[in-house]
Amino acid sequence: MDAIFAFDERLYSAIVAARNPFIAVVAIAITYLNFFGLQWWLLGVVAWRTRGGRRGLWVALTVFIGMVLALASAESLKHVFQRERPFLAIPDALKPIITEPGSYSFPSGDTALAFGAAVAFGQCFPRFRPFALLLAFAVGLSRVFVGVHYPLDALGGAVVGTFWGLAAPPIVAWVLRLYPWRAFVVAHTHWDREWYERFESFRTKLVPMVGSLLDLLERDPRFRSFTFDGQTIPLEDHLVVRPGDRPRIEALVRADRLLIGPWYVLADLLLVSGESIVRNLQEGLRVAGSFGRASRVAYVADPFGHPAQLPQVLRGFGYDSYVFARGVGDEGEELGSEFNWESPSGDRVIASHQVGHYDNALPLVAEGVKPVADVRRRVRRMLPRIMDSIAPYAAGDALLFMVGTDHTSAFENLPDAVDAIGQVAPRTKATIATLEEFIAAVPTPRGIYSGEMVSGKYRPILRGTNSTRVWIKQENAACERLLLERCEPLDAFSGGTRGETLRSLWRTLLENHPHDSICGCSIDAVHDIDMRPRFARVRSEGERLVTELSATLAGQGAAPVVWNALPWVRDVVVPVSGRPTLVTCAPLGVAAAVRGRTDGVSAPDPGVIVNERLRVEVDDDGSFVIVDRVTDTRSGRMNLLIDEGDRGDEYTYSYAGPTIGSKGAVGRQATKVEGDRAIVTVDLVLRLPASLRSDRFARVPDLVDNRVRFAISLDAGASHVDVTATVTNASRDHRLKVVCETGIRTGTHTAGAGFAWLERPNRVPRKRGWVEPPTPERCFHELVAAGGANGGIALGADGLREYSVLGDGTAIAVTLFRSVGFLSRGDLPERRGQAGPQVETPSAQCLGEMTFRYCVVPLGEGIGVPEAARAIREFLSPAWVATGSGAEESFCSIDGDPAMTLAAVRARTRDRL
């Protein structure tokens, strides 16, 4: 210890000797601002006023407790250690530049106070934690500079303060139990229609569950209400087996005893289009209305994230509240469980975050616990834990207790448990309630959160599902476009007589939208046996409908005509008499298949294709460079493949090496010009590891051939280069991405989402303590772009939903597919625990041939993100050739860049669109 104290004295002397007038003034200012915690008291009051209500009080109390207990402990410890002040103990020491304190030196009370307040404040406001800790560090350093403490004193004070700063929230949680509360106990179930069992298997459990629920609600008036998961399709599934139960359901819905809707299915809200979300609500409200009414709270139990524009959609349907469980990050500590969620459009809804998930109060009850005394004992044991987990986040005195979880029935002993809450905690008034009653009791929140919610601090967000079983995403995108861009507009302009057929097709497609279905995170049989026929029905019947309606609108005749599904004039290359031909199309209409004026395309050299705008130079490995012929600028290298091992599951990607790329591979190349389209094909072989090793930490050394064919095409007049990649996957446990260099550096990029283009930062911050830390991979729709008028690129992808951007914006990677062999695993470093049962899913390895379509749009002068978005929409919505009279007709036109069409349907009650 003597050596430590000697070093401490030397360090003190060196620091004090380094004083100059400027440092002295700053140190004096900091130490006096911290006098009796002045700055921290002010900060606590500001936090109180900012948060408002009880939550503001709890935050201020947390800061004050951390500060006061730290100071009291430090002052008590001084009398234990009795270390003299340095200006008294060190001969010839410089005098302090503030008033000499009279107490002992170790530990520093001011430093303890500062760290106690800073650590407590940082737990309430995580984004300000670095600032608070820096300020506390400055306080400790200032106490040394002014000459009243050794460095070791400040360090000891920091340790004491940190301890009490960490202890403050649990202390406040204990205090909260003593306050009066209103507990709204919502009985519910979360019914996954298909997941680790097939739909019909789960229905065999659904039918008796609904039957017993109806009996319970009719028999026991104490069981005031039950919430059926925010969706309506389970009731339809039940009535297929027991149609006689419909009057009972209607009576309970009308009596506000059974809460249903507003959704038709609980979809994954990120993977489906914005229009699919609208149709989901439309159908859910329609079905719920047939039973009596829909719940007036937009409740979603378990989607893996929430799109930025959802508040606007909800407002459009008259909803002003949203209850959810996943998606919140560090901002949840500041916002609390109730806050205003704002969309880019400016629309807001009150959002209620179920901090403890949608089963936060399930421990209050248990199957088989029926004697009232046993129920009371269970409530006495579990209630404090539940209160401690959710009360600190509440904006007012209303607490949401969710009693239910996946596939659970109603708990008959719940009324006894609710009565026991009042006996165990007399100041807590508990009632079986609805989400509507809870939202009505929530005070107007002060906090505002803007944008999408896709973070995993409290619950895993599971966005590895963006690229799991990618064929599902591709099929869904194709079906959505078929209905939105062809079937519905053609029906609208031909009289709107096929409304019921379209509704039936939408209902079939919506059956594939629940998160366990479209995310690809169920057993193989769900996806291969149940989902494929639904997609097939939408495809076949939708295409037949298009044929019938287009024939009606195009008129009698055998002349080739071209249909354009987009409401602006555009040039397209379509097959006319077996030859790719450029045709000018009317806006959202039909035109004669007559070749338009064009300079055409050419192939001046092997691997080189040219139109009037672009020159594309393709290498033997399938990568290419784009040259802008107007500005003579060259892009970065496009279309490089990167393959990484994947030791994860259907929910989460987990890296396993080594990484292998296509750069430098030698493929077989062919170049040809067909009419107004030039194509370079490249056939190459990627030698990839066959699978993971048996320990699953790395890939095996055995290599297998994975064949790849690129068809890189350039149409006459086009501003984009199209790529069709056909991959014959022979490897297991890996992820394949295509990488394109942007040619620029930027801190942000633009990504397409439901009803929005979102600007996102390139860099993903590292987060400790999250259930699932952020990853570079994110979800997108249609386009992702880095750059603008000064250069860069935009990528468009057909049905692909996952991408990442390098931190400096120099490259964009789009995931083509993931190959995994388990529904869930519990040994992944990227996520805590299991996300489902550990079941093998060999079909999720996606072996065999797969085809991917994407395009590259060079950005620059005259082509920014809006123009690129139009070009990508044209790539994704090809015109089609039919027969008719040959007369041109346009049914709808939208003028002005960058206007985009979303949907065209006939109003149900008016003779208009």
What are these regions (language model features)?
Residues 1-41, 74-103:
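N-terminal transmembrane-helix/juxtamembrane module of multi-pass inner/ER membrane proteins
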Residues 42-73:
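Interfacial segments of alpha-helical transmembrane regions
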Residues 49, 92-178:
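Membrane-embedded catalytic cores of phosphoryl/pyrophosphoryl-handling enzymes
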Residues 179-279, 287-289, 316, 452, ...:
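N-terminal catalytic cores of secreted or lumenal carbohydrate-active enzymes
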Residues 185-186, 190-196, 201, 347-551, ...:
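Catalytic grooves of carbohydrate-active enzymes
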Residues 189-206, 229-239, 262-278, 293-305, ...:
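The substrate-binding groove and active-site-proximal loops of carbohydrate-active enzymes
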Residues 277-316, 381-400:
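CE4/NodB-like, metal-dependent polysaccharide N-deacetylase domain
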Residues 310-313, 335-337, 353, 363-366, ...:
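C-terminal (or distal) subdomains of carbohydrate-active enzymes
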